[in-house]
Amino acid sequence: MSNNFKDDFEKNRQSIDTNSHQDHTEDVEKDQSELEHQDTIENTEQQFPPRNAQRRKRRRDLATNHNKQVHNESQTSEDNVQNEAGTIDDRQVESSHSTESQEPSHQDSTPQHEEEYYNKNAFAMDKSHPEPIEDNDKHETIKEAENNTEHSTVSDKSEAEQSQQPKPYFATGANQANTSKDKHDDVTVKQDKDESKDHHSGKKGAAIGAGTAGVAGAAGAMGVSKAKKHSNDAQNKSNSDKSNNSTEDKVSQDKSKDHHNGKKGAAIGAGTAGLAGGAASKSASAASKPHASNNASQNHDEHDNHDRDKERKKGGMAKVLLPLIAAVLIIGALAIFGGMALNNHNNGTKENKIANTNKNNADESKDKDTSKDASKDKSKSTDSDKSKEDQDKATKDESDNDQNNANQANNQAQNNQNQQQANQNQQQQQQRQGGGQRHTVNGQENLYRIAIQYYGSGSPENVEKIRRANGLSGNNIRNGQQIVIP
């Protein structure tokens, strides 16, 4: 690593024109002519790109790729929903819906091409526009809004065409309950539609053909029995509503019910055709027979639906009551076990408390006994110590008295000896005073000078004579002292 910070800084600021980016730069140079707001002179003269340009470019590329993936996923999901909602028995409606569902993909080609064009020229736009992140976000939001509006218009168009398509058969009094039931089953049970569609459509076609022939033959008799038919239609509508309410909660029974209704529709259509053919030549009273048969069949359906409702209610009540009973039993068992556990715990705690109190009482009594024993032992030890001290004191006093007596005797003997010695010294002094001279010490005289003065020489023998005569032990004498000179 170099020690010069400026060299490293300038080295990191060199132009980014490596061999790995040559292909990308060639594509950028080809597309630069199409950008009118690009300043080519500044790009060629610029040697040092702005700092963090590669980081911003990678960030923009990741954002655009992520937005494209999210947009494609949302587009495919919307197409799948539209295709599932737009499936109709008529081939003409399917073809028209498929052509319209293909239009968003064609319309989305232009914004995708614009995104590819923008990704190609992103590196060139970095040099002239160092901060295009906000414009890119605005561009993405505008494109998403346009795509959403296009998809909404296409879906609205398809729903309008579906609503304008003609009905595949007439809603007569004979098959009105079946048609309402089929519509309700198609809306509530979506997952079983594809399985039972082919079988149901075949049976429905037979019913439609027979019903159409019957209606064409009985056109003359419709005016006579219009009022009666209106009342029958109202009754059929109420019956169909009841059957719809019964078929909402059973998905598994819808398949068998559609199969049964298909066969029933075929039979009703055939009967209607026969009755309508004879109604052209008979009176108005004869025209009411198919309605009677229709009412009988509808009453039979209502009875079946009522039985199914009873069975469903019984089964539903059993399904609801069984978990409740089980839950109550489990909760009761848990409550019993919990109460027993709490009771045992409380009994155990009481016994533990009693045992603890007894133990504490025993410990307290034991402590009291030990304290009493300790106090007794202490008193005994103190008494023995006192007696021992008294004995020691008495013995000590006796020994002191003996010693004092001995000392007194010794002192008395010493005094006697001292007295005798003093008497002897006094006698000797008296003897010396009777046969010698007296000298009074003056000034700085000492025994040596006194011996020279009286004996003519200061020999040790002369000095010792003077000492012995005066009872002196040393050479110390004082002024004014009288000394006997032998």
From Swiss-Prot:
Record topological domains on the Cytoplasmic side: 226-319
Membrane topology recorded in Swiss-Prot or TrEMBL: Multi-pass membrane protein
Region feature Disordered, mapped onto this chain: 1-314, 351-440
Compartments where found: Cell membrane
Bias (Polar residues): 64-85
ATP-binding recorded as keyword: no
Chief site of localization: membrane
Composition bias, Basic and acidic residues: 1-40, 103-118, 126-160, 180-199, 247-259, 299-314, 361-398
Transmembrane segments: 205-225, 320-340
SMART domains tied to this protein: LysM
GO cellular component: plasma membrane
Occurrences of domain LysM (ranges): 437-485
Keywords: Cell membrane, Membrane, Transmembrane, Transmembrane helix
Gene3D superfamilies: LysM domain
SUPFAM superfamilies the UniProt entry points to: LysM domain
Compositional bias annotation for Low complexity: 204-225, 233-246, 278-297, 403-431
Extracellular side: 2-204, 341-486
Region (Elastin-binding): 14-34
Role according to the record: Promotes binding of soluble elastin peptides and tropoelastin to S.aureus cells although it is not able to promote bacterial adherence to immobilized elastin and, therefore, is not a microbial surface component recognizing adhesive matrix molecule (MSCRAMM).
Domain notes: The elastin-binding domain is located between residues 13-33 at the surface-exposed N-terminus, whereas the C-terminus, containing the LysM peptidoglycan-binding domain, is not exposed on the surface of intact cells and presumably remains buried within the peptidoglycan. The presence of the TNSHQD sequence, corresponding to residues 18-23, is essential for EbpS activity but not sufficient, additional flanking amino acids in the amino- or carboxy-terminal are required for elastin recognition.
Record protein name field: Elastin-binding protein EbpS
The species this protein was found in: Staphylococcus aureus (strain MSSA476)
